[in-house]
Amino acid sequence: MPASQTGKVAIVTGGTANLGRLFAEALSADGANVMVHYNSARRADEAGETVKALEAAGVQAASYQGDLTDRAHITGLVDSTVERFGSWDILVNTTGVIVRKPLAETTEQEFDNSFSVNAKIPFFLMAEAFTKMADNGRVINMVTTQVAVTAATYSCYAGSKSPVEHFTKAFAKEIGPRGVTVNCIAPGPQKTSFLYGAETDDTLKWLAGQTISGELGEPADVVPVMRFLAAPETSWVTAQTVYVNGGMISPIN
């Protein structure tokens, strides 16, 4: 059974769609109050619907819109959360952007944006957590299976997610004395708009064939891992990357 998060406060970035929405729903179902972040004003309606769905679980919920590549919005998100709920215990960072191009064809703008979204955001969210997260908190960063083995045309995506593993390990040691754990989840390819927007049908079939089951993952497959890492009882699991990819790759094969 999922551990009770009653009275805890969670921030879920990218919390209106795909994994972010599922994570927010799972945390609220476990009793946590949730601040749902979303990037674009175009998602305001989705954010409102998400907040209503979370409140239906009997918890408090709110939303914050902002481009987190701007450090001021990171601070604003955290400060708004603490002001609204009184504390901050859990961070689940799902922000990400895919550039699927050969390295030599990737533009400087695409490179800069990839590193701003995939690496800068989690780095400075963790910086905020150092002084503003409650003791015994939980930090969970979403990376990708490709931090272990990178496929062709994914140099920018995998390269901009890889630093997050190192940030996570270092930050786990820096904040660990306060009982805060810091971990990564590295999903494989899943049936989401995030993947479908970057891949052809042939590539999707090939990716599915790399898993043991021959199927792409579902976002729901990752939720139990997030719940485990966010649980109050999971205090001795930190500085780790958990691969959730249907057996398609591990960091040692």
Residue ranges of predicted features:
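Conserved glycine-rich cofactor-binding loop
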Residues: 9, 16-17
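Substrate-binding pocket helix/loop in short-chain dehydrogenase/reductase
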Residues: 102-103, 110-115, 195, 207
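Alpha-helical segment proximal to the catalytic Tyr-Lys
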Residues: 131, 173-177, 235
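A conserved structural motif in NAD(P)-dependent oxidoreductases
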Residues: 211-222
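Catalytic loop of short-chain dehydrogenase/reductase
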Residues: 140-163, 168-177, 189-190
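Short C-terminal tail/terminal secondary-structure segment
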Residues: 149, 227, 238-253
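Conserved glycine-rich Rossmann-like NAD(P)H-binding loop of the short-chain dehydrogenase/reductase
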Residues: 32-47
